[in-house]
């Protein structure tokens, strides 16, 4: 009996030491060691041409010194599958891996992470999927996971119960309660081809322009295909106001926004989750007013507007949802004629 226990303990210890030891060996090769497993060659090639090619694999994916038993157990199971020849058609990230990687993004992208973490796109599974007002009016369905929980491996019924208009609702996976339902990899593909990233300074700044116009990493993760689709390959919808075709900004970054902030099949402005601008803001990109990670808008009016409007009023104090969420004049769709009828007054003369 004691001998069996000792053999079992030795086997477990060997396995515990084998995986970190193997990880350390592969890490010493700067990524090339990973290609010893031939199924990793494609991913290595993608990384080697990406903006992150100057960053070692373990920096984002974890390595020998990662203090997460589940990480090493998962690697051990992958090793067993590899030895058995039980190889997946493609290698993807489990939801657990994605959540861990999101925290690692902060080590380099501090400003972006802070803005995302303080904004609505970091909303947790519990905040999104246990919302009483939403769930009472709209029955939860698998399609909810297209934007909220896109890396979750199963369906909505395995995540929330009950699936009905009457609660109380609870998460079947309580470990995901406080985890972000829209992590970094929802909108970014870390192996996307691009120029090598520049290391940030101690204050989080980088030399040169602070923001690329179209970062190569922008991509929407499609849970059906388990692929990240580049923003450059996503369509900008042809939006309508009644029968009229709405003028759209050509900013291709918006195509990513429209994957979730989308109209219904009629493509009418303000239908579904759409916020396409018409009226005084028609033709302006979402990103002209909303910051990419935090959706901060408080300073955005001053970017384009003089303080006073044609009416002689402070644009930030007008009766719109910019000033008050309860206003009947939504800032996305407000028109001069909403307040002035058919006669828009001429600009008031300034008083010296």
What are these regions (language model features)?
Residues 1-352:
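Short sequence/structural segments immediately N-terminal
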């Amino acid at each position: 009996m004691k001998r069996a226990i000792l053999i079992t303990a030795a086997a477990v210890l060997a396995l515990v030491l084998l995986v970190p030891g193997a990880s350390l060996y592969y890490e010493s090769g700067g990524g090339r060691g990973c290609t010893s497993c031939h199924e990793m060659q494609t991913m290595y090639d993608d990384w080697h041409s990406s903006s992150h090619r100057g960053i070692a694999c373990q920096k984002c994916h974890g390595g020998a010194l990662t203090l997460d038993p589940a990480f090493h157990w998962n690697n051990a199971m992958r090793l067993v599958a590899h030895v058995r020849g039980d190889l997946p058609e493609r290698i993807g990230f489990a939801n657990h891996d994605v959540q861990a990687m999101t925290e690692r993004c902060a080590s380099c992208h501090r400003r972006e992470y802070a803005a995302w973490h303080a904004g609505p796109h970091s909303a947790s599974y519990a905040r999104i999927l246990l919302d009483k007002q939403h769930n009472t009016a709209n029955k939860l369905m698998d399609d909810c996971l297209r934007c909220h929980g896109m890396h979750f491996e199963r369906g909505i019924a395995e995540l929330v119960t009950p699936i009905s208009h009457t609660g109380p609702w609870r998460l079947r996976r309580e470990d995901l309660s406080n985890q972000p339902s829209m992590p970094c990899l929802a909108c970014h593909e870390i192996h996307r081809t691009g120029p090598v990233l520049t290391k940030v300074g101690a204050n989080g700044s980088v030399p040169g322009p602070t923001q690329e116009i179209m970062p190569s990493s922008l991509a929407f993760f499609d849970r059906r295909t388990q692929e990240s689709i580049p923003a450059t390959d996503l369509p900008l919808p042809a939006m309508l106001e009644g029968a009229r075709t709405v003028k759209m900004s050509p900013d291709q970054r918006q195509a990513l926004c429209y994957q979730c902030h989308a109209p219904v099949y009629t493509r009418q402005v303000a239908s579904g989750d759409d916020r396409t601008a018409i009226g005084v803001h028609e033709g302006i990109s979402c990103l002209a007013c909303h910051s990419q990670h935090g959706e901060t808008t408080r300073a955005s009016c001053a970017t384009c507007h003089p303080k006073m409007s044609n009416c002689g009023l402070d644009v930030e104090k007008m009766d719109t949802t910019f000033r008050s969420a309860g206003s009947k004049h939504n800032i996305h769709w407000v028109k001069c004629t909403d307040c002035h009828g058919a006669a828009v007054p001429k600009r008031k003369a300034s008083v010296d």
